[in-house]
Amino acid sequence: MDVAFPGMERHDEKNPPGDDGTKPTGGKKARPAIKIKWYWKGLILLVELCIGDYLLDRYVFGGVMLRTTIAYAVLARVGLDYKLHYGKDCWLARHPEEDLHHRNAQRVCTMLKWNGGLYLKAGQAVAMQGSVLPEEYQRMFGEMFDDAPHSSWSDVEKVIKQDFGGRSIEDVFGVAPSDQQGDSQFVFEREPRASASIAQVHYARLPDGRGLAVKVQRREISKQVSWDLWSMKLMTEYTAWVTGLPMGGMGQFVADRVMQETDFEHEASNSEKMADLIATDSSLRDRVYIPKVYREFTSKRVLTTEWVDAVQLWDRDAITGQVAPSRSATSDKPGLGLRLDDVMRTVVELFSAQMFSWGFVHCDPHPGNILVRQNPKRPDSAQVVLLDHGLYITMSDKLRRQYARFWKALVTNDDASLQRVSREWGMKSADAWADASLMRPYKNPSSSDDESGESWQRTKETPEERKQRMIDEAAAYLGDEGLFPRELLFLERNITIVQGNNRFLGSPVNRIKLIGSCALKAIRDDGQGKESIRERISTRVALLSLDLAFWWSAMKQYFGYGEGLEQELKEAEDRQLRETKDAVAELFGITVN
């Protein structure tokens, strides 16, 4: 029943009148506006920002932010795991050390391999001198020299097209890509023969019969490396600011040198320059070989050299194995029938010539970059093939001569000359750099009288005084920033890796004597003063003492009472490292096991 009130009009509920009082003819009822709570708006905005950042990071910055986030997350997880389950003061239940080290080493190694680039290079550096880490880490980090994860074939094609004006692989090399491996076909193999931190190597065989090693850079590596180096530079500057150590400019110096590795045209120039230098040395020109660079197939991100069949430096069985008369169905590769001492002598003399004679030093001599083959002219002797010429330093003549005098003073125990060179480098003490160069403690006889008194004084130190003393000692090691030659960082890296190679092969040569002899030869060739008869006798006695130490160690090794001179030096170094662990824990609050 309808009821009407005065002054009111009845309207149809389903079709209310419009603003002008007219009744609409039809249509649905208007829905009220939906009001979104503020926290939903914030969540939607956050999701949009995350998606936008991810797409920007992946397609513009090469995934650098994701890689950095993963690295920090893994390291934070490892640190938390040790805080929770390691040591007497752990926060939760204590876990067995082997299990704890194993799972965290696995986490770190997986992260390094996945991130690639400089992360993988860092893992290789730790693997070369990993005695500061637990045994589980050393085993895991040993895998860093295995083939790294390789780029997809589509990425390889994109890099070659971009660097060669849009031309395809068939147009550039004149051969078609193939999934088959072998030397009988004229192909460009899709599957890489080797994969490293910033590039991978494909084999190609041209119609004219030339075998090529085509090194193709990872597509996003230039963006990733620049970000990684920027992060490293910030950490270096932060450490310098916190501790007061004179190392603020080192981060930029290292970053500039490592960035050169991403320019393969620069690497090609380094390779050709090293080949020219070796050709001028009559003692090395037949014992060392640098693969020829093909400039017509080389660009900023593609390096093409001749293919050289050889074995890696650490493949002892292949180097020393008997030469097979012919390949059998079961033999993978016949031995070369070479002597390890012949190989390592060439390696040590090559890098010594770079440091003391040429001033142009290869700074990444890890075993993957050193191959060994039979000398084409004398098959019974070894020829070393040097690869990967991206990371070099150029020494000034002044620094080259100083470094030669530094090593002469080391092998002849000439403390006065050692301190004189160190002062020229802005160092307060030469002992630390002597330890690092020799890979063993360098004992300064003049300090022995004060040793007991200094030890007694250190027992009375407060934690703050001990921390300040360690900072002062580190500052003395690094020297005055304006005088300290930053090239020494890479020189010591070279020395350390060569020492590791010699130790792995069982110390076949007296490395310290060989380096010292090359330094003495360079000093004579440069005419840096004439030696008196007394100095000559002193030098010969010092070299003879090194020979006696080497042969005594070799004799013990032969009868099963040792593992060679380098291993004995390594044990002395390990004792120093144990002291360093305590110092690091005191200085930075980091427990290194």
Swiss-Prot record:
InterPro entries: ABC1_dom, ADCK1_dom, Kinase-like_dom_sf, Mito_struct-func_regulator. Induction: Expression is positively regulated by the leucinostatins biosynthesis cluster-specific transcription regulator lcsF. Residues 8-22, 457-467 have a biased composition (Basic and acidic residues). Residues 1-29, 441-467 are annotated as: Disordered. It comes from the Eukaryota. Belongs to the protein kinase superfamily. ADCK protein kinase family. ABC1 family protein; part of the gene cluster that mediates the biosynthesis of the lipopeptide antibiotics leucinostatins that show extensive biological activities, including antimalarial, antiviral, antibacterial, antifungal, and antitumor activities, as well as phytotoxic. The function of lcsO within the leucinostatins biosynthesis has not been identified yet. This is ABC1 family protein lscO.
